[in-house]
Amino acid sequence: MSGSLAFHIIMSVTFMVFFFGGLCEARGVNVDLINDIGPNVQLGLHCKSKNKDLGSQSLVSDQHWGFRASLGFWTVTLFFCHFEWENQSKWFDIFVEDRDLTCGDHCVWSIRPSGPCRLTGREKCFPWNNKY
């Protein structure tokens, strides 16, 4: 293999890695959760995806917490959260790429006793997921 051909192959591979890698990381949605369970009710939550555990959080009434969901180039992004307050334990798929792309780059959720309500994009309230 000539030096010139090897150089062009290396440059092409480098370009593709940076170009496609940059596209994958650049695409994302900020997901913001608001504790609207009720006055003086603390909301515990734990969100994760297949590959990323965001850890446990605790929100006082009306407090916000958020994360950035990177959109996959080859896969569909899904984040789910487990919520606890008083004697309740619920879970919900908080970001589903196909469902939530109407949010644009910022998806805001109001977490309520009856279920999460998406406030951006097409506003809609959802029931909690089944237990299993």
Swiss-Prot record:
Pfam families: Self-incomp_S1. Coiled coil: none annotated. One of its GO terms (biological process) is rejection of self pollen. Residues 1-26 form the signal peptide. It is found in: Secreted. Glycans are attached at N87. Keywords: Glycoprotein, Secreted, Self-incompatibility, Signal. GO terms for cellular component: extracellular region. Belongs to the plant self-incompatibility (S1) protein family. This is S-protein homolog 19. It comes from Arabidopsis thaliana (Mouse-ear cress). The gene is SPH19.
